[in-house]
Amino acid sequence: MARKHIFIGCGGAGSKTVALIKMKVYESLQNVSGNRSKVDVMNDNYRFMFIDTDAGDIDNLNEKFRTKYENGRVKMLSTNELINLGTQNPYVIYQKAKAAQEIQINKRIIEACDDEVAMHMDNRALKFGAGAFRLKSRTAFARLADQFCEKLVKNIQDLNKIEDNAADNNTVCYWVVCSSLGGTGS
């Protein structure tokens, strides 16, 4: 039975922790030979996902590991692994949800965030973070939940496609790393 792993980092603290785990897994791979890179070998058993609002934090992590990860040829945190909540404007999302309350996800947004709370949201995208305001990132995540699900399903399918292991024999372990005090990760 093959054990496969999907690590999901939520918010700044979660993303930093999962990035460190990814680097440890990468560095632990020894004696990689043939035409496969360490990343190829790592991808046989591991997938990593990052959910964050602060693009600067993601850029800083890529810069921190730039010389250690594939000698800088590829970014350590790729766009395929990132759910970028920083592109979303929670204030606008809430207003659109109020205008179309018959849609299920909009009902959930309105249930989670009442008018009084929504009035305190800035009318801007979250590219500089959620500012420890949990409902900002949760509202943004609601809009990108389908994208998250698609990436998660693709990761599961890719891990089960590895030819030397039958999918029936794989056990996929999910590791979600987040914080309890911030905005996006809590």
Short names for language-model regions:
Residues 1-178, 186:
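Segments that form or flank anion-binding pockets
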